[in-house]
């Protein structure tokens, strides 16, 4: 965490249902860290994730890979068998922290020494102050949480929580212990780590919190604080038209994160041939910002009042995400709607599922060409009545999407909301309750005299995040020269990330303990694919 956040939040213990102010302050600090992280722009019965795969013959501690299955393909992987727990048990966490408050519905009376431990692998994301450990009392159960990696081999360390942007296949903790699950928190862009967009990468995890509605703890609406955020009054048409007459273009583009997987600048460049667009950021800049302080477009994520007032003058905002993936929607979409501008959107293909009504955004991909889109925008720009139909969701009763309304109502976490936990604390409590349920199920299975199947591990699926290969913002990949920076960077990164997931899976399946051998496994993966082709 930043020094500023440390000074702001200097004490107290987080719990479910109390200390709401502290929780919200922590949320603000954590969001600062998350924003800064984006680039400019397992015998006893133990449930595990990938762990020891079924390719091994036998269930003893000394396993020999099957000769037929040394090179494991993605579609041949199966959940692991049960393996003994780690023998390491010397660490005593009983004195690390005192008990904190009880959460509603939590009757857990175990001492700290008896609780399962959750380890935050990304230290900067640890959502507690002060120190490096805390007891959390969640809706159903309690856990110890820590960022101290010295406990990673502890028999009570039941889950490791990773932050997606920081997760590196070549730095993953090996060997993967059979008694531990892995949890993934990733609310940021797919471009930050394409390993997670492939099945070999995402299935390494047992619990997920991502922007996808299909994840275990969805963060899809992270940029929408409340439904009321959408109902903020728009500038009058008279004022918007006045700014148009004063020389403002109908469309605003403000972006300083260039050369991204969505290749948005390539499309904007073509659109500019047919439509007047004011571009103030470093990408496609064609106009100087009247306020020098606001030239840094990082102010966009802080909702700086002057920035918001300035951008509200524009009738249309080009709202183009830096990567294309289902349910990945950011402030680029929600901010124009808050201000009363019409988003011209490209990003999540499923975005309409989340809109306040069925007539509130313009989808770039609904038009055959940039020229066709430009003609439509110019028509709306000159027709106030038709333009205002896109803002009817701001009227009383205008937000009619019951899916959006119910999703917001059921959301367990909040944004700047003192009555709800932030999503970091919410997810760790989700993992805590799941791990306590898993431990209980394993104990029941071991005590059972009737045999039967052991508890199945919960494993993430492709749709918990899986995102498609990047495609050009305009035209086809075949038309783009091989020397093009977008083609060299993002297509290569996407497919190398697939190989990294395959390599790490193979290392885990073979009980590899040496992280330095990762690139040997990468080479093996490459050779295997070459032979298959």
Curated annotation (Swiss-Prot):
Membrane side Cytoplasmic: residue ranges: 1-20
Protein's cellular compartments: Endoplasmic reticulum membrane
EC number(s) recorded for this UniProt protein: 2.4.1.221
Pathway where it operates: Protein modification; protein glycosylation
Catalysed reaction equations from the record: L-threonyl-[protein] + GDP-beta-L-fucose = 3-O-(alpha-L-fucosyl)-L-threonyl-[protein] + GDP + H(+); L-seryl-[protein] + GDP-beta-L-fucose = 3-O-(alpha-L-fucosyl)-L-seryl-[protein] + GDP + H(+)
Cited Pfam families: Glyco_tran_10_N, Glyco_transf_10
Gene Ontology CC terms, in alphabetical order: endoplasmic reticulum; endoplasmic reticulum membrane; Golgi membrane
Cystine residue pairs: 429-432
Annotated GO MF terms: alpha-(1->3)-fucosyltransferase activity; peptide-O-fucosyltransferase activity
Residues bearing attached sugar chains per UniProt: 148, 206, 358, 511
Lumenal side: 38-533
GO BP terms in the entry: positive regulation of protein secretion
Membrane-crossing residue ranges in chain numbering: 21-37
Membrane topology field: Single-pass type II membrane protein
Keywords: Disulfide bond, Endoplasmic reticulum, Glycoprotein, Glycosyltransferase, Membrane, Signal-anchor, Transferase, Transmembrane, Transmembrane helix
Keyword Transferase in annotation: yes
Coarse class of the protein's main subcellular location: endoplasmic reticulum
Protein purpose: Protein O-fucosyltransferase that specifically catalyzes O-fucosylation of serine or threonine residues in EMI domains of target proteins. Attaches fucose through an O-glycosidic linkage. O-fucosylation of EMI domain-containing proteins may be required for facilitating protein folding and secretion.
Similarity comment: family membership: Belongs to the glycosyltransferase 10 family.
Protein name per UniProt: GDP-fucose protein O-fucosyltransferase 4
Native source organism of the sequence: Xenopus tropicalis
Gene this chain is encoded by: fut11
